[in-house]
Amino acid sequence: MATYAIGDIQGCYEPLQCLLEKIDFDTAKDKLWLVGDLINRGPDSLATLRFLYSIRSSLEVVLGNHDLHLLAVYFGLRKQNKSDTLTPILEAPDAPELIHWLRQQKLMHHDATLGYALVHAGIPPIWSLDKALACAREVEDYLRGPDFKTFLAHMYGNQPSVWDDSLQGQERLRLITNYFTRMRFCSADGELELTTKENAAAAPPGFAPWFSFMQRKTRQDRILFGHWAALEGQVSTANVYALDTGCVWGGYLTAMCLETGALVQCACEA
């Protein structure tokens, strides 16, 4: 039995199959942890989502910004962007089933036995692991509940940009979502900078990669994340593992075995 964490797939079905063949994945005994952005921008989003749904009992999934965007588009709360490749999913006869499954997924997963946490973008330096899990549950409960469309309709936006425990309602949910699904750079007190998408060296004044702060409350916790392709999987911070290696941009799709730390990759075509 093995557990593999896989970076952003983004509808790249063939590299995913290549990777599963390389690791000799067995649904009967192995598990996959997926860092989110399962779909969008790649060539085979529908095939990817259908396949993942078919092996759902072997998966732990956290949602990425593209997955949440699909939900908003599907429910008519947002229009597709020019770079989106979501139409085949939206028009699929099994779309309601796939979308319902996606809506049940997490923003954060933690396995104390394996000793890893899984998120799409990151955890702000001001949150402990328990605080992050509690905040993730707030959004997950809303997304799974009867009023989920209200959340999706108010999800977009860059404000508020800094955490305050007194935040309430949709502003609170939006900031939690931005931390988990959009964050790259922030300040030591958790203020988000959502404009810069280049590598760590491009940090604007006063900001740094979320994982780089000495006083970060999760420094002793092992965190797997995706989202930040410009890092090319390179992080010089202990206990932090960047798994988005730019598959959809012609890079690689990466899997990491949680039991051994071994990396396996398949090359992708842009």
Swiss-Prot record:
Keywords attached to this entry: Hydrolase
Catalytic activity: P(1),P(4)-bis(5'-adenosyl) tetraphosphate + H2O = 2 ADP + 2 H(+)
Class of enzymatic activity (EC top level): hydrolase
Matches recorded under InterPro entries: ApaH, Calcineurin-like_PHP_ApaH, Metallo-depent_PP-like
Pfam families: Metallophos (PF00149)
Keyword Hydrolase listed: yes
EC code(s) of this entry: 3.6.1.41
GO molecular function terms attached to this record: bis(5'-nucleosyl)-tetraphosphatase (symmetrical) activity
Keyword Metal-binding in annotation: no
Function, in words: Hydrolyzes diadenosine 5',5'''-P1,P4-tetraphosphate to yield ADP.
HAMAP family cross-referenced by the UniProt entry: ApaH
NCBIfam families xref list: apaH (TIGR00668), PRK00166.1 (NF001204)
Family per similarity comment: Belongs to the Ap4A hydrolase family.
Name under which the protein is recorded: Bis(5'-nucleosyl)-tetraphosphatase, symmetrical
Species of the source: Cellvibrio japonicus (strain Ueda107) (Pseudomonas fluorescens subsp. cellulosa)
